[in-house]
Amino acid sequence: QLELAETAKSQAMDKMDAISKAQDEQKLVSQLLNEARQAKADAKNGNSSDITTTYYTYDKDGKVTGSYTETAPKGKDYNPMSNEMVKYMDEHGLAYDKTGDDHMHTEEEWDVAITALEGRLEELGTNTQQEMVYIQDYMGQYNSYLQGANTQISNSNQTLTSLAKGQ
């Protein structure tokens, strides 16, 4: 019973780690979503100055293999995605507008990225809720196994006490 309780506890701890990682990712996606919404508003109003962004290329292990820059000139109605946003969205297969084969977006083009990030945020929230259900299940198992072990110990103590009194 105690071994089963430990197994349930271990499984619950693993799920709690997964939830913690998902919550960290949710924070990042929320930041990227806020960044995209602000960039959309900025694109609508036109850039107050040149905006140059450096982008990096990565290999399959995530190591930087190169870099390049893109510039949105002052007064234009488009602006660039951040390198962090491009990297995250590429790593997770999220859609963003690729018109012009660059990372510059007009107000309307930002909607694609915003919709994708909103969807990812919702997906992470749903996954976290499911993980919490699993934790509740594992904790129920843990409590049940501990109660069973305590009952067995109590019964053994009663048996030993009876034997001791009988001698």
Language-model features and meaning:
Residues 1-105:
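Low-complexity, intrinsically disordered export/secretion signals at extreme N-termini
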Residues 1, 15, 22, 29, ...:
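Amphipathic coiled-coil alpha-helices
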Residues 34, 45-47, 79, 83, ...:
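Detector for Asparagine
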Residues 129-167:
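Proline-poor, low-complexity alpha-helical tail modules
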Residues 85, 113, 117, 159-160:
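Generic structural signal of hydrophobic/aromatic residues within well-ordered alpha-helices
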Residues 75-77, 93, 99-129:
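Fold-level signal for large, globular catalytic cores of enzyme and receptor domains
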